[in-house]
UniProtKB/Swiss-Prot annotation:
The keyword Lyase applies. Its main location: cytoplasm. This is Imidazole glycerol phosphate synthase subunit HisF. It comes from Bifidobacterium animalis subsp. lactis (strain AD011). The active site is at residues 12, 131. Heterodimer of HisH and HisF.
């Protein structure tokens, strides 16, 4: 595990606006991703992730503008994902201030995207986003964890553990592991999935999906994650980044 545990808020951005509800009384505009990013920076976030949920070419410039404005105000690593299909997309996001780029569906459709991006920009730039769920009924994968797309609505039949290991071989620098079963439940991370992923990859794992309280975070690290990512519990002010870090410290983990 890396030395300090990273705590990462995630912002879903649709046509330049944050779409999951955000409740901060001190923000003039809780839907503005730049203002919200600055708030999380003040709270002590280690990194930030923007997910462009529209991700159509017509909205690409909007996201570029958001990243540019954010990078001028915050000085922690910024990851941008959603609709990244080519090395040129990666180049444009890095040029406007992103530090890392996450890929998902496009890499499933063309795994060479991973190696092409890694060779051109370095594997530290590339985050593989895996939306995984437990198979129900008849099992088609060896591990029982299947890769999904379309926000968990579409099955791929691809084993999530196999895919992450393959992506690491191709040059991915990190895995963002999002449990589609736990996502939005606020019942805690899928620890079994994290443990299973830790056994097959050596690159850092960012655990996502299921955080509901500060006490949910240390078990994810104990299971093998190097970083923890959450959205709604931070947006609604249910838990602060400081409270998560305090809980991690109490559990004996180093935080920045």
């Amino acid at each position: 595990m890396s030395l300090a545990v990273r705590v990462i808020p995630c912002l879903d951005v649709d046509d330049g606006r944050v779409v999951k509800g955000v409740h901060f009384e001190n923000l003039r505009d809780a839907g503005d991703p730049v203002e919200l990013a600055a708030e999380y920076y003040r709270q002590g976030a280690d990194e930030l992730t923007f997910l462009d949920v529209t991700a159509s070419s017509s909205h690409r410039q909007t996201m570029v503008n958001v990243v540019t404005r954010t990078a001028e105000q915050i000085f922690i690593p910024l990851t941008v994902g959603g609709g990244v299909r080519t090395p040129e997309d990666v180049d444009s996001l890095l040029r406007c201030g992103a530090d890392k780029v996450s890929v998902n569906t496009a890499a499933i459709n063309d795994p060479t995207l991973i190696s092409r991006v890694a060779e051109r920009f370095g594997n530290q730039v590339l985050v593989l986003s895996v939306d995984a769920r437990r198979e129900r009924g008849e099992q088609h994968t060896q591990s029982g964890f299947e890769v999904t797309t379309m926000g968990g609505r579409k099955s791929t039949g691809i084993d999530a553990l196999w895919w992450a290991r393959r992506a690491e071989e191709l040059g991915a620098g990190e895995v963002l592991l999002n449990s589609m079963d736990a996502d939005g439940t606020q019942q805690g991370f899928d620890l079994e999935m994290i443990r299973a992923m830790r056994e097959v990859v050596s690159i850092p794992i960012i655990a996502s999906g299921g955080a509901g309280k500060a006490q949910d975070f240390p078990p994810a690290i104990a299971a093998g994650a190097d970083a923890v990512l959450a959205a709604s519990i931070f947006h609604y002010g249910k838990v602060t980044i400081g409270e998560v870090k305090d809980e991690l410290r109490r559990a004996g983990y180093a935080v920045r």
